[in-house]
Amino acid sequence: MNLPDLNVTCTCVRVPILRSHSISISLQCEKELNLDEVKESLRKQKGVIYYDDLVNKKYPMPILSSNQNNVYVGRLRKDKVLKGGVALFCSGDQIRKGAASNAVSIIKCL
């Protein structure tokens, strides 16, 4: 293609998996976010494990999140396509932390 100004954000995911769902998320925000502040906020969230160390090849994978209630989040980076965008990757056990258990968690908060 030879398009030096073409902005692309991508995530590689390998399958098959035994359990747990994963999702690549791109968020568009009204303003640019400081990634260090986003990381710190994610680390403080109950039920979230911020797991992101690309040097040591540690990032969210289905095998890590299987059989637990925590959701692993990582691969946080600026989205090069969306203005004010952030991209991240999440993995969580769909049986332990799926729609039904999330509904129960929300009801408890209310």
Where are these regions (language model features)?
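C-terminal substrate-binding/catalytic lobe of Rossmann-fold NAD(P)-dependent oxidoreductases
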Residues: 1-87
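NAD(P)-dependent Rossmann-like dehydrogenase/reductase catalytic/cofactor-binding core
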Residues: 70-73, 77-110
